[in-house]
């Protein structure tokens, strides 16, 4: 049953369950339930998962390091939905703490699948709106702003 086939109350319960499951995985240093949500075919389940990761990172300081470790692990996963959701989770964290997830964006920017690369652009846009600075990876000469991705150029689009 897809997310929006559920009633509003059931959706809220499902989001709460996703949050609890991911937090439990992080506390146990496991990834089974988180992986099932990150790889789910339903976009809204994946959205609930990446938003939960952002909330857990922000509200539970002792789990921050484990959260980043989980994202690092998932960033290398063979399933593009897992990698895409990982980028989106990094975007949730990057709104407040960009430096700790910048390397996740670096990896995703050169992913073989377009949905992962597109997630990088969308997530960095979200972060940029909050942190008010462009994302530029000097050594690779890659710049992303709120309007363009310029590979191999030092051109910056205006925001």
Residue ranges and their predicted role:
Residues 3-25, 47-61, 83-96, 115-130, ...:
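Structural detector for internal amphipathic alpha-helices that build alpha-solenoid repeat scaffolds
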Residues 73-81, 117:
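Short, mixed-charge aromatic SLiMs
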Residues 2-6, 39-42:
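A generic short-segment signal for beta-strand/edge and adjacent turn/coil regions
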């Amino acid at each position: 049953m897809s997310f929006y086939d559920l009633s509003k109350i059931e959706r809220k319960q499902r989001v709460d369950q996703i949050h609890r499951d991911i937090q439990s995985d992080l506390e146990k240093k496991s990834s089974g339930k988180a992986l099932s949500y990150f790889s789910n075919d339903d976009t809204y389940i994946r959205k609930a998962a990446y938003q939960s990761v952002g909330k857990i990172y922000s509200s539970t300081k002792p789990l921050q390091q484990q959260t980043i470790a989980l994202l690092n692990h998932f960033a290398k996963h063979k399933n593009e939905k897992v990698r895409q959701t990982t980028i989106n989770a990094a975007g949730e964290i990057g709104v407040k703490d960009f430096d700790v997830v910048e390397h996740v964006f670096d990896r995703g920017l050169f992913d073989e699948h377009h949905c992962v690369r597109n997630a990088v652009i969308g997530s960095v846009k979200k972060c940029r709106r909050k942190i008010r600075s462009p994302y530029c990876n000097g050594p690779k000469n890659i710049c992303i702003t709120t309007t363009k991705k310029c590979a191999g150029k030092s051109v910056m689009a205006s925001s």
